[in-house]
Amino acid sequence: MNGQITDLDFFFNPKSIAIIGASDTFKFGYTMTNYLLNSNFKTYPVNINKDMIFGHKVFKNINDIQQDIELAIIVVRNEYVLQIVKDSVKKGVKGIIIETAGFAETGIEKFIKIQEEIEEIAKNSNVRIIGPNCVGITNFNNKFTTSEINFDQSIEGGTISIIAQSGVLGNIFVEWSTSQKIGFSKTITLGNKVDVDEIDMLEYLERDTSTNVITIYLEGVKRGPKLIETFRKLTKPVLILKNGRSEIGSRAIKSHTGSIAGDDKIYDTIFKQYSGIYRVNNFYEMFNIAQVFATQPLPKGKNIAIITSSGSLGILACDEIERLGLELAVLNETTIQEMKSFSPNWTSLKNPVDLGPSLFMTFNKSLSAILNDENVDALLHIFAVPQNPLETFSIPITPHLREMRNLSNKLKKPIITCVFGSRWVLEYFLKHSHKYKIPIMTQISHAIKAFKFMYDFSKSNKNLNKNLEI
């Protein structure tokens, strides 16, 4: 909210860092301290009770460091934070991340006042502050983090960024999404938002060339009119998970980050009013849809084709298509006749196309015929084959993934695969899906909603004909 410094790149690519409360014992801050001190980032540990940490000299105070410091990360007990913020401002840092919890969210007057004093410091200085009660920033492009991210397990080349008011939940988002082979560009956790808020970060990510899709976990907003103004200017798709729909949930928010949730109906109206802003129901849905935006071309129309190995699941997809106002594509007769030429006579070749057991013999040819049909704008692939035949016959999936990717690129039509069965079957796809950039999910409703949001975005004035592929 501090309007004096709007370029927040020092949070994501700091030239120099001080960790106040740096630790070499197993407590909060240990993992970050160990990682940053052994990274290429110029990092200085500060701890009044230590002389050496992981072989590095420790400073008693940030002002004992002779070199300039761009970013201060604070991980000390809450009663010490205010003085350390003052010390950091005196040092001339550009940014402060306060990871410590225990402020306004406690409801305790003493800690509410401390947070208010920190907020005043932010307003009256050129220092930008994230937090308190957060885990800060992760930049997957340069591998900078103030959290506990394991870059050895993360997916490289992602273009999805996360803004989360919750700290730990931000890490959980990354961990789950990584297991689904969904890659990220940046994650930002804001906590109690004494200064930097979701609006500041939306503006930053809008300018960020490595971010194509923005996701937000939101509890409450302090600057409503400014948020609306920002929504008008954004040109990238934004997926929002806003909690506090119920009265119980709204009350719980205040004790979590100290935010006021507000009337959920107002939020709902605002989200629906602006193109490119889409509300989701849970984080699984949010990141499943985000990966479709990040990896697939936008559809030119709303006609959806389905290839399935289960007729029943194909029918369920039809229900979702109608419910969301999309259309089941009517295949040209020439397309149907082409598929008849290589398909067993018992297959159902009208959309949804049910290939049944012939899936592995006829899939690629059927896929090509359907995607080349001018009546088809997008394709849902439903895979429902048990583990046993896949494992017994060592059936490869990569030729199908490769063909899906090649045709999607060539014809500029999005494809989503929904996998049904055991975790083994899902992993059978996931271990190859990132290479071919085919979104893999387990919920048909998420896939159809992704097509719906992408179709709406393609019609909006925010679609600048940008290719949103990773």
Can you annotate each of these PLM segments?
Residues 1-470:
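Catalytic-core regions of core metabolic enzymes
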